[in-house]
Curated annotation (Swiss-Prot):
This is dITP/XTP pyrophosphatase. It comes from the Bacteria. Substrate binds at T11, K12, N13, M14, G15, K16, S74, F158, G159, Y160, D161, K181, H186, R187. It is an enzyme of class 3 (hydrolase). Its cofactor is Mg(2+). The active site is at D73 (proton acceptor). Pyrophosphatase that catalyzes the hydrolysis of nucleoside triphosphates to their monophosphate derivatives, with a high preference for the non-canonical purine nucleotides XTP (xanthosine triphosphate), dITP (deoxyinosine triphosphate) and ITP. Seems to function as a house-cleaning enzyme that removes non-canonical purine nucleotides from the nucleotide pool, thus preventing their incorporation into DNA/RNA and avoiding chromosomal lesions. HAMAP family: Non_canon_purine_NTPase (MF_01405).
Length: 205
């Protein structure tokens, strides 16, 4: 019997790993994460765009592991802050990464800016890299539009979810159930685009 084809997700975030595992198990693809390869060092994100960082991570790890690797780079883009925090979303308030400090910094920088001028979006770039040298990395992306609230709301999610207002639900992202969030989130939308490509990219159909 042929063993299941493996896909490595370039993250240690188990929430992300579960999202990918649910998608890929429908196609008999086994998902591994960086927890399964403790000797591998994290790739430094030196790109200037989400796409560059996702490709950088996927390509480097694919060559190291000789495996198909999926990497995502995502973050928050706030129009009134000229696109910040952008690719620096995870470390906006500096090292070490701290979600609460990042939220505080965004709220501070938007102080006294009215709600209708606080337009923002979450952006996710997903890159897939293949160990075969002749196959270039491929990429999909997804966005979720909203506004930045003046204070935190909700207990769910992570990152900037408590201050991101989703008009479709009239709630903060952190007030949504996981099903509601997956239906509209940037990563959920990118994953659905990826799902359409699985037969072609992963199964050679």
């Amino acid at each position: 019997m042929e063993s299941m084809k493996q896909v490595v997700v370039a993250t240690k975030n188990m929430g992300k790993v579960r999202e990918f595992a649910e998608l890929f198990e429908r196609f008999d693809l086994e998902v591994k994460s960086l927890h399964d390869f403790p000797h591998i060092e994290e790739v430094e994100e030196t790109g200037e765009t989400f796409e560059e960082n996702a490709i950088l991570k996927a390509d480097s790890l694919s060559r190291q592991l000789n495996a198909i690797v999926i990497a995502d780079d995502s973050g928050l883009i706030v129009d009134a802050l000229n696109g910040k925090p952008g690719v620096y979303s995870a470390r906006f308030a500096g090292e070490p990464k701290d979600d609460q400090a990042n939220i505080d910094k965004v709220l501070q920088e938007l102080n006294e800016i009215p709600f209708d001028k606080r337009k923002a979006r979450f952006y996710c770039a997903l890159a897939v890299a293949f160990p075969e040298g002749d196959k270039k990395p491929v990429i999909v992306n997804g966005t979720c539009e909203g506004f930045i609230l003046e204070q935190r709301r909700g207990e769910n999610g992570f990152g900037y979810d408590p201050i991101f207002y989703v008009e479709e639900y009239k709630k903060a992202m952190a007030e949504l159930s996981s099903d509601e969030k997956n239906a509209i989130s940037h990563r959920g939308r990118a994953l659905r685009k990826l799902e359409e490509k699985i037969p072609e990219w992963f199964l050679g159909e």
